[in-house]
Amino acid sequence: MLDTLRKRLRSEKGFTLIELLVVMIILAILMAIAIPSYLSFRDRANRSAAGADLRAVIPDVEAWFSDHGTYAGMTPALLKASYDQSINTTMYTITSLSATTYCVQATSPNDTTKTAAKKGPSAQIVIGATCP
């Protein structure tokens, strides 16, 4: 009888419920580590893309000023920005427009906002400035 039981156990193939549960627990632990890392990586990439797009828009803003002699009347749609339009995830807002000042805000999909402002005709462009 014992020999019959041993032969039967050897002939049965497959995984036990415990083995399957152990594999599922290991996969859950790996996913618990990987998913937050991936989301963090994606957020950093979006912030970096927003900053790069903002730096690409600034020459177009200055070109507008060269052509028109003022920043007034400028809109994001009128700019010929060379930012990455294949992704097109960054939204731009232009505020505080006057003849000599502007503030451009680039907002990434995770609501990270990067700003660049020029406050005066001979002022430097400040990235990270606060917009009024």
What are these regions (language model features)?
Residues 12-38:
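N-terminal single-pass transmembrane signal-anchor helix
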Residues 59-132:
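Periplasmic/extracellular, small/polar-rich flexible segments of pilin-like filament-forming proteins
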Residues 14-16, 47-60, 66, 126:
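Extracytoplasmic/periplasmic mature domains of Sec-exported, cell-envelope-associated bacterial proteins
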Residues 1-15:
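N-terminal leader/signal peptides at the extreme start of proteins
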